[in-house]
From Swiss-Prot:
Name assigned to this protein: E3 ubiquitin-protein ligase TM129
Subunit structure: Integral component of ER-resident dislocation complexes.
Function (record text): E3 ubiquitin-protein ligase involved in ER-associated protein degradation, preferentially associates with the E2 enzyme UBE2J2. Exploited by viral US11 proteins to mediate HLA class I proteins degradation.
Protein species of origin: Bos taurus (Bovine)
Zn finger spans (RING-type): 285-350
GO BP term (any one): response to unfolded protein
Length: 362
């Protein structure tokens, strides 16, 4: 392929990926289906269910048009190929054009099926119909969902492509093409996985993401998974009526302090160990009085300057957890990105030390 063809292909590929997965920059620029078709979609706050009935249909149609958009663009980017005359184009391009035309045709057929009988065939409407009373329809359930979504006390989190919403009665997950709904009174929630991510856009501390399986007692309601930050776990539990079970070996860090303690411990493990003289016996930690003292402060930096680390002459008196809690308690809660690089006074002699000075006792 020549240069204009390559340039357009790469540019369109980037645009298509960003249009489907919508990063923050595209949201800020308004290049989303929700923003471009806001006049037809209406307001999510005013009518949650009708909004998402139309949004999922519009999203499916817009995304199905992307291959056709690429073909039309290539008609101008590679005009020498005469792609605007399908009968004269190579077999490969004719096959691509056929696929590009079939996708929106299939999408339109599916959307037409969904919209029959006032959207009664839409997957969201069919799920809501499972919770309808014998003499009422899914619209009555949708009205209840709309009312609860308008309340300010709902729990809402997640990125636009995977939002989690919990109201007084409903647990919902809003994705690009679908809205999962389950009623709180008959769901079983299980934390199936806890993933630790070392990089955070807001701080140098790790982020723990929890995966929770939401399964309804009604077998006709498909189960789904929600993901959220572990720091939001407590708020989620307050909104839920049903308890959340945890799978074996899943440890949940519900606060920033929990995440810091884990990072603090991992850094101490790579520091040089401190060998206790044979004549010295280790006593119980003076912080918790429950475990044996396990760390010693040993100055590692060589330069002596104002505000830098100082030598601590205290014997091992603290366990790793208590020392980590002391270190965290001396930090600015609004600046977690500075915690690991800061220096704090020894809890006993007040000599200043950093994380690199905390050595495990051997």
């Amino acid at each position: 392929m020549d240069s204009p063809e390559v340039t357009f292909t790469l540019a369109y590929l980037v645009f298509a990926v960003c249009f489907v997965f919508t990063p923050t920059e595209f949201h800020s620029a308004g290049l989303t289906v929700q923003n471009l078709l806001s006049g037809w979609l209406g307001s999510e706050d005013a009518a949650f269910v009708p909004y998402h009935l139309r949004r999922t249909a519009a999203t499916l149609l817009c995304h199905s048009l992307l291959p056709l958009g690429y073909y039309v663009g290539m008609c101008f980017a590679a005009s020498e190929k005469q792609l605007y005359y399908p009968s004269q184009t190579p077999e490969t391009w004719r096959a691509f054009l056929l696929l590009a035309l079939m996708l929106p045709a299939i999408a339109c057929t599916l959307i037409y099926y969904w919209s029959r009988d006032h959207w009664a065939c839409h997957p969201l409407a069919r799920t809501l119909a499972l919770y309808a009373l014998p003499r009422s329809g899914w619209q009555a359930v949708a009205s209840s969902v709309n009312t609860e979504f308008r309340r300010i006390d709902k729990f809402a989190t997640g990125v636009p492509g995977a939002r989690v919403i919990v109201t007084d009665t409903w647990v919902m997950k809003v994705t690009t093409y679908r809205v999962h709904v389950a009623q709180q009174q008959d769901v079983r929630l299980t934390v199936t996985e806890a993933q630790q991510h070392e990089l955070s856009p807001d701080s140098h501390l790790p982020v723990q993401l929890l995966t929770i399986r939401v399964a309804s007692a009604n077998p006709a309601v498909p189960a789904f998974h929600i993901r959220l930050n572990s720091t939001e776990y407590g708020e989620l539990c307050e909104k839920l009526r049903a308890p959340i079970r945890s799978a074996a070996n899943v440890v949940i860090h519900q606060s920033l302090g929990d995440l810091f303690l884990e990072t603090f411990a991992s850094l101490v493990e790579v520091n040089p160990a401190y060998s206790v003289p044979s004549s010295q016996d280790l006593e119980a930690c003076i912080g918790c009085m429950q475990t044996q003292a396990s760390v010693k402060l040993v100055k590692t930096c060589q330069e002596v300057a104002v505000g830098e680390c100082q030598q601590c002459y205290c014997r091992p008196m603290w366990c790793l957890t208590c020392m980590g809690k002391w270190f965290a308690s001396r930090q600015d809660p609004q600046r977690p990105d500075t915690w690991l690089a800061s220096r704090v006074p020894c809890p006993t002699c007040r000599a200043r030390f950093c994380v690199l000075d905390v050595c495990a006792v051997r």
